[in-house]
């Protein structure tokens, strides 16, 4: 089998729920990341060709049945680049990378692009239809399930609680981890460690706001304190 090399990697800045990137769907953001990667590596200008794209996501794009295909069509890549979509919940993006590596290892591809995209700001709900004839029953959101039985129907938040209980991880330890994570992220941002990996996203101007170039992580809370964390509900 052939060896696989990761040549480069980029991303957009992390947004927050209902924040600056709320108008962009996951395919919009993923296409911008792909174009940024192509510009950074100058792959196409050097005569290179991307064989395929593996894209992962825990949520599905509300505007497409084939988000990986739509992403490629929105990018600089051509129609002849095949795509595949991977859904493995929180492991979707890393699984997409594994699939891309496997394709290169076995010789079905030479150059692949792989990664993940998500937009919680554009998360949609599925609604039920009227199921009782002759009754006007308003559509209701259908709860999304991850398991066929209640004990399997748990998301990552519930899983984290279960693991904390299983291994005796205390609330104090969780707060310390969260605090250190925020401080390290803020310090890394201030020192410019993420600058080369973040692809700017241009947010168009409106009647009330000017054009904005979004090129940093929005979720950071550098003013986080241990006292503030300890006051949050468990």
Regions inferred by a protein language model and the residue ranges of each:
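Short acidic, glycine/serine/threonine-rich loops at helix termini
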Residues: 18-19, 64-66, 122-128, 214
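N-terminal extracellular/periplasmic Venus flytrap/periplasmic-binding protein-like
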Residues: 11-12, 23-32, 43, 173-234
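Flexible glycine-/small-residue-enriched beta->alpha junction loops
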Residues: 111-163
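Short glycine-rich anion-binding loops that position phosphate/pyrophosphate groups of nucleotides
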Residues: 12, 59-60, 117-120, 206
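Active-site-proximal alpha-helical scaffold in enzymes
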Residues: 86-118, 164-193
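Conserved catalytic cysteine-centered active-site region
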Residues: 24, 57-110, 150-158, 223-234
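Conserved active-site "lid/cap" helical segment
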Residues: 1-75, 79-82, 90, 162-171, ...
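Beta-strand segments within the central parallel beta-sheet cores of soluble alpha/beta enzyme folds
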Residues: 47-56, 83-85, 112-117, 173-180, ...
């Amino acid at each position: 089998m052939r060896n696989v090399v990761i040549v480069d990697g980029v991303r957009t800045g992390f947004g927050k729920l209902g924040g600056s990137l709320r108008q962009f769907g996951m395919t919009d953001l993923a296409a911008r990341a792909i174009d940024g990667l192509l510009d950074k590596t100058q792959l196409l200008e050097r005569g290179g060709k991307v064989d395929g794209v593996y894209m992962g996501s825990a949520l599905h794009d509300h505007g497409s049945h084939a988000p990986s295909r739509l992403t490629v069509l929105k990018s600089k890549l051509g129609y002849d680049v095949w795509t595949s979509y991977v859904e493995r919940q929180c492991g979707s993006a890393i699984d997409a990378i594994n699939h891309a590596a496997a394709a290169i290892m076995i010789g079905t591809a030479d150059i692949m692009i792989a990664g993940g995209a998500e937009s919680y700001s554009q998360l949609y709900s599925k609604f039920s239809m009227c199921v009782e004839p002759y009754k006007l029953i308003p559509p209701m959101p259908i709860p999304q399930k991850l398991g066929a039985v209640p004990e399997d129907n748990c998301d990552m938040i519930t899983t984290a609680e279960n693991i904390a209980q299983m291994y005796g991880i205390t609330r104090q330890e969780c707060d310390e981890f969260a605090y250190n994570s925020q401080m390290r992220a803020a310090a890394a941002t201030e020192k410019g460690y993420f600058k080369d990996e973040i692809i700017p996203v241009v947010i168009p101007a409106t009647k009330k706001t000017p054009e904005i170039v979004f090129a940093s992580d929005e979720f950071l809370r550098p003013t986080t304190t241990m006292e503030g964390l300890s006051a949050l509900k468990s």
